[in-house]
């Protein structure tokens, strides 16, 4: 007997079902089931994937949803006592009308009815029931709940649904009954009781529902509430439930596990994908309930439309004024408007200078004719294929952004190959001049809608998206949902935590998963140590097996970083929408690929901070010089720019800041924009291997050879090396007479490694090349090289567009360094490390970075004649609203004349005394009083005087005469310097760093700068590039000292936070070194040291081997240093193999401590510690909370591993004996260490 599963959950019922769509459908194929429904909880997330997978496997897909129905109104969001938040209801799509209604219902459940879960109500259901089949759902449905109450309630509920859905309403019966043998395996009495109570309810409901339904003429269907695939998947499912609840399903006690009664669990272990035979046995007394599932399936004949585009349309303004028009008239008008914009672009974009560049590229050709012919080709394809609206919509958004001063990038992706996009201003790089092809953007041989991605200034991105919403309607625009999945490492950690497996073991397994893209299976195959653990350790094997079952499960939802969907009418006419967690904007329920496949237009709005920097710099330059620079018009042959690159001074240059890029720029010495394009394409995994040849060929150190003379014009600009995908297209055209469209088809086939297609293309290429007079063996060799190259070839259009950004930033740095570095500092002011490097870069270019000044500084860092003036907004503790107030008053009433003048004019509603003190210490008032301590004393008196008088004036206490007196006899505040306590220069400098994030006016190392060349020191910025085991000399400033006690040996050690003039880093001083050098470990002390580079773990670590106070360094100290240095270099400092260090990460473990050891310290053994122990311990600490600080120290193999230092949650009662007794009684692997500081 055929049975159709109609109540099924996939992993899109997030953290409530384990079935992937692929395996779910495969199981239906195994059972030879002809149709299958998907009814995830409250959403349609997986509908398109499910539909396509079913179609691929010749199974009829039935798209449905188990909706949540509010007991009253969906707008009622108060939980009544003994009242359910929502009841369950199954809806299945019969046809397209039903699909639209289900999309709308699911959407409104999120946007209107969300309360714990997305909910509809009966009122909404009554309005949108057409085309839907309704099933009464499980025990959580209102029908089942009514059956448990009374026959009268049941009949009333059934009649309501029957009246609404007529013959398309089916009552639903389920029976998740196990054999007594299976029930006997339940470990807990309460679990058995839950099971029997559950089955008793199901039997009672089934009996009542079947009888009443029969009497009312309502057909019934038998379903199984599927949440996992196989009978033995129940445990993986239970683990998944408790990944969500964060309860361990069991807890360790002595040498065994005790089930956790607080865990989430299903009452039966029968929620798997049963076979038709199993269902037939369960419902043998009611075979019609099985037959009726086939009737439901027969009524469902939804066909999703993957051909129609639901793109928005563009109506030219002239046509809007007309009022009424046909679609033919509208498209004709849109086409004409597009052509009109292009004609305007021909005049404004193709200047004589640009046409001259094209003429130079194509001697003997009329450049404007070439442009017009190219435009004619592009227009014919774009207009005939109905793409005008798409281009005009993108043009409209970009044009609005530019009109409103929001910087937009010069192009991204293959769109930079289109002349039409260049004329419209969508891109800013001329394609003919740089051999960029339209066919790479839209291939005439295989026409499909292209992607046009938009780079936008980070600050203006939200405004642009809001414009798109306003322009096209809030119901027509949404962001795109994303689904976060359990990768291998996360699955191991989630499962290990839920099984309460020892943390050290869990993290040991996780550490052996090599990277984010690795699977557990591949890790087992590649790692003998992990494989051996799997064989030898049953506990580890259980974690791995369960994690394999859950690997890839969806864990959470998010929002796509850039993608926005724009539809021509309300989205819910075509797709469901939702509101993802932690998001305020509407999002699609379908992820990126499915949502595009059903005809939605995706536009990527990518925030690019570099554009913000360019905008700030060019505005500053315009203000200073009257010259408005634009990326599209700056000269591409500027010698200052190339000279800067030759020096490798690429800090602050887009995509060229890395050490590798600096070296590439110095070695290549680019002298043409085309070489900058090539740099962007070459510096990636794969083609990076060709960089040495590329450099050598440019400088004549390596011969440039071509496999055939026809390849020389194509590969000449890249010195005979294939770098771009477009070169494959050109070679195919030149040697084998491919059209550019055919060449793009070849490129795609090579990139996808489509073996079947490649066999055809090889034969086609070689035969056509032979017809063109090319030797077959040469043709085969060339094809082989093209095929190998295609796996890493780069899109030249994208490289050119981004190359223009690179060149623009280099041009700004070379010609307007102060303005450019000031702009970068403004963009990155909250990234202290970046600010430090930019300031160092400014110093290297002989540009001073000056402290903030009350009359020169504003919100941004600003270029002045003297240097770069620090931003007021970047001073810690001074908000932008205060800065706005200061600047507004300055612009309105002129510069501040003195500290008193400033305080007198300050708005005390916005400015506090503490903020003014911060401004003083930051140097903001040095122009009036360079002695900061004296300025603070004056400020204190001024603030008190004027704030009091302004308050009195505001309340009317001061009379007209007293105010007049104040005006005639202004307040005079004088403070004698002798009465002011003066801070030391070191203290002032430290305070400066606290407020500005960097040492600005001076650095403690300035005094010893002359010594450094003689000390052979390596700066911190070079550490990252050094190999494991390298011994180095360095100099640093101690910023912070944290003293600790090792748990194993009870010996003191220290963690230092240290820095040089640019970088900061952490440096441990272990017990043996600490005993020797403890007297040197003082904050603000300069140290000369020998360090060893340790790369045995995943990250760079440093180990200190010798140190001295830098102020004591003399010839004998240098000799001692040299002796230690030589000895360490001759030794094998570290083993070359990486050792397993056990636990690598945990939410409750910090590898870096920032507080001193506490009076009470408890040591926990990671080898025996379980997640449940931490829960118990946390509860006990709360139970015995008090004023005594507590630290937890984690050990592994008797070695200190990590610790948790005191915070608000780790203070216990002074009398800790009771706490310690309870800890001992719980079998937590803990011991109390000495309680002295």
Curated annotation (Swiss-Prot):
Transferase listed as a keyword: yes
Pfam families: DNA_pol3_alpha, DNA_pol3_finger, HHH_6, PHP
Record's keyword terms, sorted: Cytoplasm, DNA replication, DNA-directed DNA polymerase, Nucleotidyltransferase, Transferase
InterPro entries: DNA_pol3_alpha_NTPase_dom, DNA_pol3_alpha_thumb_dom, DNA_pol3_finger, DnaE2/DnaE/PolC, DNAPol_HHH, PHP_dom, Pol/His_phosphatase_N, Pol/histidinol_Pase-like
Residues passing through the membrane, by range: none
Catalytic activity: DNA(n) + a 2'-deoxyribonucleoside 5'-triphosphate = DNA(n+1) + diphosphate
The keyword Nucleotidyltransferase belongs to this UniProt entry's keyword annotation: yes
GO cellular component: cytoplasm
Enzyme Commission number(s) of this protein: 2.7.7.7
GO biological process: DNA replication
Enzyme class: transferase
Annotated SMART domains: POLIIIAc
CDD domains, per database record: DnaE_OBF, PHP_PolIIIA_DnaE3
MF term (GO), any: DNA-directed DNA polymerase activity
UniProt-annotated location(s): Cytoplasm
Protein family (similarity comment): Belongs to the DNA polymerase type-C family. DnaE subfamily.
Subunit structure of this chain's protein: DNA polymerase III contains a core (composed of alpha, epsilon and theta chains) that associates with a tau subunit. This core dimerizes to form the PolIII' complex. PolIII' associates with the gamma complex (composed of gamma, delta, delta', psi and chi chains) and with the beta chain to form the complete DNA polymerase III complex.
Purpose of the protein: DNA polymerase III is a complex, multichain enzyme responsible for most of the replicative synthesis in bacteria. This DNA polymerase also exhibits 3' to 5' exonuclease activity. The alpha chain is the DNA polymerase.
Protein name: DNA polymerase III subunit alpha
Organism field: Chlamydia trachomatis serovar D (strain ATCC VR-885 / DSM 19411 / UW-3/Cx)
């Amino acid at each position: 007997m055929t049975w159709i599963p109609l109540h099924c959950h996939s992993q899109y019922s997030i953290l409530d079902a384990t079935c992937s769509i692929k395996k779910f459908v495969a199981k239906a194929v195994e059972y030879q089931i002809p149709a299958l429904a998907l009814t995830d909880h409250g959403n349609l997330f997986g509908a398109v994937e499910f539909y396509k997978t079913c179609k691929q496997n010749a199974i009829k897909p039935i798209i449905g949803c188990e909706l949540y129905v509010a007991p009253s109104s969906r707008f009622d969001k108060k939980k009544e006592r003994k009242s359910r938040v929502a009841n369950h209801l199954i809806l299945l799509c019969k046809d397209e009308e039903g699909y639209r209604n289900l999309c709308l219902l699911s959407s409104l459940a999120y946007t209107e009815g969300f309360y714990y879960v997305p909910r509809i109500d009966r009122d909404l259901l009554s309005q949108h029931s057409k085309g839907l089949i309704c099933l009464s759902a499980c025990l959580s449905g209102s029908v089942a709940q009514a059956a448990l109450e009374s026959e009268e309630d049941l009949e009333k509920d059934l009649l309501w649904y029957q009246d609404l859905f007529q013959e398309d309403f089916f009552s639903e019966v389920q029976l998740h009954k196990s054999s007594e043998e299976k029930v006997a395996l339940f470990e807990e009495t309460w679990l058995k009781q839950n099971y029997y109570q559950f089955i008793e309810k199901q039997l009672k409901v089934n009996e009542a529902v079947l009888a009443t339904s029969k009497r009312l003429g309502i057909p019934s269907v038998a379903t199984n509430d599927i949440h996992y695939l196989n009978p033995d998947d129940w445990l993986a499912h239970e683990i998944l439930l408790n990944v969500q609840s964060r309860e361990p399903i069991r807890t360790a006690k002595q040498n065994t596990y005790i089930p956790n009664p607080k865990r989430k669990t299903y009452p039966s272990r029968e929620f798997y994908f049963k076979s038709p035979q199993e269902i037939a046995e369960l419902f043998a007394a009611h075979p019609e309930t099985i037959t009726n599932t086939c009737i439901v399936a027969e009524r469902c004949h939804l066909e999703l439309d993957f051909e129609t585009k639901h793109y928005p349309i563009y109506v030219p303004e002239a046509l809007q004024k007309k009022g009424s028009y046909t679609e033919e008239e509208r498209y004709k008008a849109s086409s004409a408007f597009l052509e009109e914009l292009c004609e305007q672009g021909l005049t404004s974009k193709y200047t004589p200078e640009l046409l001259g560049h094209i003429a130079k590229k194509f001697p003997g050709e009329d450049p404007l004719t070439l442009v017009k012919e190219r435009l004619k080709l592009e227009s014919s394809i774009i207009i005939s294929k109905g793409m005008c609206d798409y281009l005009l919509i993108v043009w409209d958004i970009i044009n609005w952004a530019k009109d409103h001063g929001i910087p937009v990038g010069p192009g991204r992706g293959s769109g930079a190959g289109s002349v039409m996009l260049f004329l419209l201003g969508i891109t800013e790089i001329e394609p003919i001049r740089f051999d960029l092809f339209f066919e790479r953007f839209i291939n005439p041989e295989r026409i499909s809608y292209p992607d046009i991605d938009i780079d936008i200034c980070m600050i203006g991105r939200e405004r642009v998206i809001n414009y798109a919403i306003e322009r096209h309607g809030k119901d027509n625009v949404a962001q795109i949902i994303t689904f976060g999945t359990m990768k291998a490492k996360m699955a191991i950690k989630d499962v290990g935590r839920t099984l309460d497996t020892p943390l050290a073991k869990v993290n040991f397994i996780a550490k052996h998963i090599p990277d984010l893209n690795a699977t557990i299976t591949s890790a087992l195959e590649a790692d003998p140590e992990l494989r051996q653990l799997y064989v030898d350790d049953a506990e580890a094997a259980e974690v791995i097996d369960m994690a394999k079952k859950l690997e890839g499960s969806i864990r959470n939802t998010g929002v796509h970083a850039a993608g926005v969907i724009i539809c021509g009418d309300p989205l819910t006419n075509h797709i469901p929408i939702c509101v993802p967690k932690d998001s305020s904007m509407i999002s699609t329920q379908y992820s990126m690929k499915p949502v595009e496949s059903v005809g939605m237009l995706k536009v990527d709005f990518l925030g690019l901070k570099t554009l913000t920097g360019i905008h700030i710099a060019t505005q500053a330059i315009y203000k200073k010089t009257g010259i408005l620079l634009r990326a599209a018009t700056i000269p591409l042959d500027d010698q200052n720019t190339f000279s800067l690159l030759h020096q490798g001074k690429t800090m602050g240059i887009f995509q060229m800041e890395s050490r590798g890029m600096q070296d590439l720029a110095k070695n290549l010495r680019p002298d043409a924009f085309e070489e900058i394009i090539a740099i962007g394409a070459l510096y990636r995994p794969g083609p990076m291997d060709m960089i040495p040849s590329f450099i050598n060929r440019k400088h004549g150190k390596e011969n440039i050879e071509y496999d055939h003379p026809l390849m020389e014009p194509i590969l000449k600009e890249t010195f005979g090396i294939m770098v771009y995908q477009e070169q494959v297209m050109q070679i195919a055209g030149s040697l084998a007479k491919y059209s550019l469209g055919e060449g793009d088809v070849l490129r795609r086939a090579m990139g996808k490694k489509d073996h079947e297609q490649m066999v055809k293309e090889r034969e086609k290429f070689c035969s056509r090349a032979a017809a063109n007079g090319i030797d077959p063996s040469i043709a085969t060799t060339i094809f082989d090289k093209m095929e190998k190259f295609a796996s890493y070839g780069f899109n030249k259009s994208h490289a050119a567009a981004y190359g223009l950004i690179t060149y623009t930033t280099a041009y700004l740095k070379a010609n307007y360094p102060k303005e450019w570095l000031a702009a970068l500092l403004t963009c990155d002011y909250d990234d202290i490390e970046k600010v430090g490097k930019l300031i160092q870069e400014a110093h290297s270019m002989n540009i001073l970075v000056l402290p903030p000044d009350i009359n020169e500084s504003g919100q941004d860092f600003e270029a002045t004649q003297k240097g770069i003036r620090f931003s007021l907004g970047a001073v810690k503790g001074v908000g932008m609203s205060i800065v706005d107030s200061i600047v507004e008053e300055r612009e309105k009433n002129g510069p501040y004349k003195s500290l008193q003048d400033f305080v007198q004019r300050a708005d005390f509603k916005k400015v506090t005394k503490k903020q003014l003190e911060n401004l003083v210490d930051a140097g903001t008032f040095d122009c009036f009083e360079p002695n900061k301590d004296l300025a603070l004393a004056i400020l204190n008196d001024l603030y008190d005087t004027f704030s009091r008088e302004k308050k009195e004036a505001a309340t009317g206490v001061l009379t007209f005469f007293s105010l007049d007196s104040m005006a005639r006899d202004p307040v005079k505040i004088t403070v004698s310097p002798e009465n002011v306590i003066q801070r030391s220069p070191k203290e002032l400098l430290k305070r400066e760093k606290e407020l500005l994030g960097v040492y600005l006016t001076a650095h403690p190392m300035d005094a010893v700068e002359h010594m450094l060349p003689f000390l052979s020191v390596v700066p911190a910025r070079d550490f990252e590039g050094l190999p494991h085991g390298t011994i180095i000399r360095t100099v640093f400033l101690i910023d912070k000292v944290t003293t600790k006690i090792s748990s194993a040996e009870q010996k003191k050690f220290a963690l230092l936070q240290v820095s040089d003039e640019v970088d900061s880093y952490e440096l441990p001083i272990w017990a043996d070194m600490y005993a020797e050098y403890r007297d040197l470990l003082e904050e603000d002390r300069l140290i000369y040291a020998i360090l060893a580079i340790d790369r045995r773990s995943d990250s760079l670590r440093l180990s200190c081997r010798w140190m001295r106070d830098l102020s004591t360094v003399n010839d004998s100290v240098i000799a001692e240093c040299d002796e230690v240095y030589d000895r360490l270099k001759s030794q094998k400092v570290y083993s070359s193999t990486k050792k397993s260090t056990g636990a690598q990460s945990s939410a409750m473990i910090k590898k870096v401590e920032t507080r001193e050891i506490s009076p009470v310290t408890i040591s926990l053994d990671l080898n025996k510690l379980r997640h449940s122990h931490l829960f118990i311990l946390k509860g006990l600490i709360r139970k015995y909370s008090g004023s005594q600080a507590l630290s937890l120290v984690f050990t592994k193999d008797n070695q200190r591993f990590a610790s948790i230092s005191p915070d608000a949650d780790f203070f216990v009662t002074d009398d800790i004996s009771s706490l310690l007794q309870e800890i001992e009684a719980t079998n937590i692997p803990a011991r109390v260490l000495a309680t002295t500081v």
